[in-house]
């Protein structure tokens, strides 16, 4: 339990019947008339939904501990992603829903952060940018600007993104894992 006076960004609260909410923003307000209160912006850890919530100052709220561990993606086992703890070599099977959009960028050997609460996997987080190889793309045609200078390309994971016309099959590129945007070539 913590007081609303102790809130800080990143703190995870247990509200609304056990749902986990992360504090994105908070502001202590002391109006000229009336009691002080804390205005917060909270993000649901599982769904990503963002809500505004106001608490009276000094009220106790339940906090939750999220265990984040760096784990290496080993292989797919049916619909499950198998991760290995780099310290204990224990294996953890994570379902596709918990992996989320990170599945578009996972290849064997990648290190990801796996977040758990009371033994349940909440989400899998990748670094902001990863390096992947272009598996397939059409050759860029000189003067083709109808698509704004980009063309579709399939990554080695099977995920499709837009890349500049000069990128060819087999090249290694850097991709933003949050937006699926092309960031640049990787110098070998």
UniProtKB/Swiss-Prot annotation:
Keyword list, A-Z: Cytoplasm, Elongation factor, Protein biosynthesis
CDD domains documented for this protein: S1_EF-P_repeat_1 (cd04470), S1_EF-P_repeat_2 (cd05794)
Entry keyword Cytoplasm: yes
GO terms of molecular function: translation elongation factor activity
Pathway the protein takes part in: Protein biosynthesis; polypeptide chain elongation
Subcellular location, record wording: Cytoplasm
SMART domains: EFP, Elong-fact-P_C
GO biological process: peptide biosynthetic process
One annotated Gene Ontology cellular component of this protein: cytoplasm
Source superkingdom: Bacteria
UniProt cross-references to SUPFAM superfamilies, sorted A to Z: Nucleic acid-binding proteins (SSF50249), Translation proteins SH3-like domain (SSF50104)
Functional note: Involved in peptide bond synthesis. Stimulates efficient translation and peptide-bond synthesis on native or reconstituted 70S ribosomes in vitro. Probably functions indirectly by altering the affinity of the ribosome for aminoacyl-tRNA, thus increasing their reactivity as acceptors for peptidyl transferase.
Family, per entry: Belongs to the elongation factor P family.
Descriptive protein name: Elongation factor P
Organism: Streptomyces avermitilis (strain ATCC 31267 / DSM 46492 / JCM 5070 / NBRC 14893 / NCIMB 12804 / NRRL 8165 / MA-4680)
Gene name of the record: efp
